[in-house]
């Protein structure tokens, strides 16, 4: 699978509120179980409830696979999906 960074820009304040409300009720275990398929796997999210964009790292076969995994949630955002073939992990 390829690495993708996705900027999910909320289409409205209401959509932003729905996103963060729903996200706050999901455990990491639930996300691990339900945000993965053979074609797309959610890896990590960076978000701030005060901002109109949230960022996600995905491993996926294609941008379409990410949108398919998101399902109806994809409609909350304008999804700017960029393949990132160069990854440098210098984490501690």
Predicted feature locations:
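Conserved short beta-strand edge segments in small beta-sheet-based binding/regulatory domains
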Residues: 75-88
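Short S/T/G/P-rich N-terminal loop/turn motif that feeds into the first structured element of a domain
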Residues: 1-43, 48-52, 61-68, 86-92
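Short, intrinsically disordered, mixed-charge
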Residues: 68-75
